[in-house]
A protein has these predicted regions:
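Hydrophobic h-region of N-terminal signal peptides that target proteins for export
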Residues: 6-15
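Short, polar/charged, Gly/Pro-enriched helix-capping and turn/loop motifs at alpha-helix termini
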Residues: 35-36, 70, 118
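Disulfide-stabilized extracellular recognition modules
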Residues: 90, 94, 98-153
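A short alpha-helix/helix-coil micro-patch that ends at or immediately precedes a cysteine
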Residues: 15-65
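Positively charged n-region of N-terminal signal peptides that target proteins for export
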Residues: 1-3
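Short, surface-exposed glycine/acidic/tryptophan-bearing loops
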Residues: 49-103, 121
């Protein structure tokens, strides 16, 4: 049996400040950034969404349990199907996945340095996000990350 630990990075209680991951991402978005030779201007801050968190959590758990990295789940689900399963209605949707970094800030830095992931981070077309990670100590990949982006209709 694989050891599977799951932790979604949930925002702090209302009124006590935003989640550090959300704050870090919004700091990245507040400044213009070049992603793979393409300049992206500063983008508005994102808000945390619990339904996106649930979808991200489910996908990290699936990847960690089955030792893979990808945008399609073992059940054949796509990001669209996973967020809709959680009741999230959307007009724009995106997903970043990663493995390896033990800390959320390191995962954000890695995404910011990858052109496609960076474009998601900087997209002004998204208004909400969530990040979750799962750990499988017996997998070569170790820590799995999913970041969901969305904009309601």
């Amino acid at each position: 049996m694989r050891l599977l630990l799951l932790l979604a990075l949930l925002p702090a209680c209302a009124g006590q400040g935003a989640d550090p991951v959300l704050e870090a991402l919004n700091r990245i978005r507040a400044e213009g950034r070049t992603c793979g030779g393409v300049y992206h201007p500063a983008a508005p801050p994102l808000a945390w969404d619990a339904r996106l968190t649930a979808a991200a959590r489910a996908h990290t758990e699936d990847m960690a349990a089955h030792g893979f990295l990808g945008h399609v789940g073992t059940d054949g689900s796509t990001v669209r199907e996973r967020v809709e399963r959680e009741g999230y209605l959307w007009s724009a949707l995106g997903e970043n996945v990663a493995y390896g970094p033990a800390q959320a800030e390191a995962a954000l830095r890695a995404w910011a340095e990858s052109p496609g992931h960076c474009a998601n981070l900087m997209s002004g077309g998204y208004s909400e996000m969530a990040v979750a990670h799962a750990v499988n100590a017996r997998s070569d990949m170790g820590v799995y990350w999913v970041q969901q982006f969305g904009t309601p209709p």
